[in-house]
Each structure stands twice: as C-alpha cells, then as structure tokens.
C-alpha cells in the first residue's frame, strides 16, 4: 500500500506514532489535527479526530478527501466487555456496530443507522495482516470480535448491562469506530479497527481509564506500527 491513514481520538492515542514519523508535517483544520510523513518507508497520515462520533466522521471525511489513503486503521483505547479480557489486551474488529442508534420502529436492527448496513466489516486483508503481526508481539494478548460505538463512556452499570443484553458478543466499546467505519463504507475505503483496553466496562471505568490510558495507547501503537511495516514490505 502506498499511503496508510491512522486515526485516533486523543493526543495520547496518536502521539507515539506521530513522534516516529520522518519528515513530519502537522496541520489543523476544523478541529482535526493531521500529522503526515513516512513510517518505515511508508507514506502515512495520522489524524487526531477528537472524541465522539461526529468529530470522528468529520475528521475522517476531511482525511479521505484531502489525502485519499489506500486504507484506514483506527487505533486507540476502548472499554473491554469480553469476560476473559484485561486492561492492555488488544481487540481486532471482526465487525463494527453502533450501540446507541434506535430505529427499530422502522424495521431496522437495533444499532443500525437507517439506509446503512447494520454492521461494518473490516477489510479481510488488513485483518489478516493484523493477525500476522500478533506473532511478532509476543507480550500482547489479542482477541478478535465485535467492537461497538456510542456517544457514552461506559461507567454506568445500567448502560453496561443494557449494552451486554443487546450485543452479547461485543468485546469492546468506544466512541468513534462505527462513525469511521460508516464514513469509510460511504467512500469505499478499506478499514480495520485496532483497540487496546484501558478499562473493563462497569469496573470503576472512569478511574481505571485515567490510570491505564497510556498503557493502552502504547499497546495499540505497537500493533499499528507493526502493521504499517508489514504492509509497506508487502507493497
């Protein structure tokens, strides 16, 4: 691949990768920050979108229009929902859904935006590359499954229980991925979501998030950097 885009919501989620760019250039527009340069010989643009679905969609649209990448990797932190998952574990998306959209009365699935797919499937090649990179990162525990998105931080037990009931197979919840996936779907751009867990949903999530965001950001960045290197070698 000639050009890879990486998207994270917060500075903590993108700065490690951005600091490794050669010939780094930074620009800001409409609330989004773009870092461009080369990583392991691959042309890369890194977007810090801001938190939440609207910020993610706006930033991703700007990114796709201005830079026209061959693929998008969404990285950063998430809250874990899988019973066997722990802080620092990495989740690769098998599919991505909204968990806070309700148009069921019109015949849509819960979580489905009208006239859009109920779930967004990541690019199989990008998922395979992510799997291959796991072998070289022995210290990371990695799972693959459903990642759900909503404009809510999962610290409330009632919200956590409701999400578990509606999406029993969900491994991770966060606040941007489905908006990024939906935008990529509309533009026909391949994507994958790679998230490291900063907290386990419902278990003092607000406290553990602050304590472990750096660990989660480091683990997700390690995975993404390994993917960029492998994708560059294969191109």
From Swiss-Prot:
It catalyses: S-adenosyl-L-homocysteine + H2O = S-(5-deoxy-D-ribos-5-yl)-L-homocysteine + adenine; S-methyl-5'-thioadenosine + H2O = 5-(methylsulfanyl)-D-ribose + adenine; 5'-deoxyadenosine + H2O = 5-deoxy-D-ribose + adenine. Pathway: Amino-acid biosynthesis; L-methionine biosynthesis via salvage pathway; S-methyl-5-thio-alpha-D-ribose 1-phosphate from S-methyl-5'-thioadenosine (hydrolase route): step 1/2. GO terms for molecular function: adenosylhomocysteine nucleosidase activity; methylthioadenosine nucleosidase activity. Its EC number is 3.2.2.9. GO terms for biological process: L-methionine salvage from methylthioadenosine; L-methionine salvage from S-adenosylmethionine; nucleoside catabolic process. It comes from the Bacteria. This is 5'-methylthioadenosine/S-adenosylhomocysteine nucleosidase. It comes from Chromohalobacter salexigens (strain ATCC BAA-138 / DSM 3043 / CIP 106854 / NCIMB 13768 / 1H11). The lineage of its organism: Bacteria, Pseudomonadati, Pseudomonadota, Gammaproteobacteria, Oceanospirillales.
